[in-house]
């Protein structure tokens, strides 16, 4: 089922799952507006992470830039390829794919529609009709690791990734580098769930790490990460969320979240395709662009000196003094 937004809808709540309403005068509006069609990540809406953040960006485009928005979830189409093909047939201004897991299918469909503009978030394509947008997740994870090291009493912290891949390893490497910048002797436990939609697996891995004395956990694992945050809360430990502010998942445990402004990526794509014709290339977003940052520190007794140290590290990133590889 196609999901479209009415101009009258100005509030988009996290966790939206039902079908949206059709715009007031669809025949007229479709002709006059640019249209963005998005295939959400495999977990879809309600992940309190990647897809929800993208939806926020789509809402901003619709509200401020007068774009017409359409999207698909895999629960409807059963495959990325079917979703991309369905949307490409509609000839929107741009078809957007979220996440590296859909890259192969996006590129397959993009080759079939060489005059259609596509965009890919979180991976890089070499095709002439695919615009790529990536993030410097290692920068934000560096700050997350520093915060974890400051908070940790056991000098052992944990990282749980959704799937071992070059993208998620950027989170891990940044986290480790930030932690050792604060405490060179800190121990960083690492596990991969190999699933972005398995909260129970996240909980299992979190409990195993906490048995090894990890008292701060960082999850870059989509919906799997919610199990990590909840497990940390149950044991009275701290956790760091990802992509969006995930405090609501475990209010007593989440001390901050590494914010990855996927909504900004969506609006950047809109601005780029609006400004010029068919294009490729790569847009890279980091701390300097306001696309990567930490949510406010909470549930942690940081001293003024420790908070200042975090700000210093952020400034060093802005000045190019810290480069996480």
Summary of predicted features, one role per range:
Residues 134-154, 258-276:
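Hydrophobic alpha-helical segments within soluble ligand-binding/sensing domains
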Residues 58, 143-185, 190, 282-302:
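An alpha-beta-alpha
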Residues 15-18:
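C-terminal motif of bacterial Sec signal peptides marking the signal peptidase cleavage site
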Residues 31, 36-57, 61, 70-80, ...:
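Extracytoplasmic "Venus flytrap"
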Residues 20-23:
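Bacterial signal peptide processing site
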Residues 92-99, 119-121, 213-222, 242:
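Periplasmic-binding protein-like
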Residues 111-135, 243-255:
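Flexible loop/hinge segments that line or gate small-molecule binding clefts
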Residues 274-325:
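Hinge/cleft segment of the Venus flytrap/periplasmic-binding protein
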